[in-house]
Amino acid sequence: MKKTVVAAMLGMAAFAAGAAEHQVKMLNTGKDGAMVFEPSFLKVAKGDSVKFVKVDPSHNSAAVIVPSGATAWKGKMDEEISVKLDQEGVYVYVCDPHKVMAMAGVIQVGKPVNLADAKKQSAELAKGFVMNKDRLAKALDQVK
């Protein structure tokens, strides 16, 4: 019995060790201009985590589009948060105070099962952008 429990625990540890943590920086200025997440597109495996890192002040990360069955997140202002992504699909997130400046990003987890819906909702979201109107569409174009 003890051998079975130990074997099960080792198996779970090996599975957990396979999950990666990726980082997304919250920036005032980056390679794509003002008020950006870097990278703006990230492809990860199911079970991986994404940590939103505060580099510059006055930013947060809030999921606005998630796959069916997934839980959205909303970080506080200037908060570094780590989000575990267990549901396959496309996630779109924004910085609440800079959403109008198209401070948005996309995470693809495994297969993009909700891509059509994510593109449709993102097109509506982009109507509220006052600058960088194609930034979110460019990030979504990287989903494969």
Walk through the language-model features, giving the residues of each.
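N-terminal signal peptide c-region/cleavage motif recognized by signal peptidases
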Residues: A14-A17
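Extracytoplasmic copper-binding redox domains, predominantly the cupredoxin/blue-copper superfamily
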Residues: A19-K144
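Sec-dependent signal peptide recognition
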Residues: K2-A8
